[in-house]
């Protein structure tokens, strides 16, 4: 399964923050999943791609986050995984998360990087968020 993320997204590692573009193409990279376990992934530059920009407003704090990704990323909404989130949906990134309301979804064309899983894992941390990724069947 391949998921594209915009080139301005960062991946939070346990002791570091790295731009996706700093990963070496074709090399195995270890990144943490939602449980804090490390998983192997491959990164590849995919050129200019049409991506979605999701603007999220925290339900209880004065905080706004922007995530740029392809629409095949699965989000957790009220305990259900879905890809077709809409404006007004509330997404959560872990069990203790109070929730983020989707306030805007727009299209953008950006430099994009693909993330391919070497071991079939289903989650990745991008911009501090857990994004679920399903394997193609």
Name what the model sees in each region:
Residues 1-137:
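Autoprocessing domains of the Hint superfamily
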